[in-house]
Regions:
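Cell-envelope/ECM-targeting effectors and their regulatory/trafficking segments
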Residues: 1-142
Length: 142
């Protein structure tokens, strides 16, 4: 018998591709009620961060002048244990005046690493223990 969880499970190999992006979107929809489109793409991320993230091999849009992604915004809210409400976060009117940006940053990667008890170097290596830990957690919810 195959359960829904195992049927939708993603690979836990420490490499982030479109499958991990889709899994994260589903995970954020489940735990944050984020209402994200599950398309397997983390949109509009700063190209300057790509060298810091060699473990990301697909499912990301690296651009100059990045506007950010609702998926990363939801993940940042989750990591900070804050409710997700997209319109409020962008203008600073979220809880305690918080602004959650939707771009990947070194502090954001360190926050993800701290969540999993992994050494905080602000990188997503190839392959990455941090990505593998996230993939394992995603599989608990999708």
């Amino acid at each position: 018998l195959v359960t829904a969880t195992s049927a939708n499970a993603i690979s836990t190999d420490g490499w982030w591709g479109s499958e991990t992006s889709s899994g994260l979107q589903q995970f954020m929809n489940t735990v944050m009620n984020a209402g994200l489109t599950v398309d397997g793409v983390i949109s509009s991320q700063p190209s300057s961060m790509a060298p810091n993230c060699p473990g990301i091999v697909g499912g990301w849009e690296w651009v100059d002048g990045a506007a950010g992604s609702p998926t990363i915004q939801a993940m940042n809210a989750w990591l900070k244990h804050l409710p997700y409400n997209s319109p409020l976060w962008r203008d600073g009117s979220g809880p305690r005046g918080a602004i959650l940006f939707g771009t990947i940053t070194i502090p954001g990667i360190k926050r993800l690493q701290a969540h999993y008890g992994i050494s905080q170097d602000g990188r997503l290596d190839a392959p990455s223990q941090t990505i593998m830990a996230l993939q394992n957690e995603i599989n608990q919810y999708v």
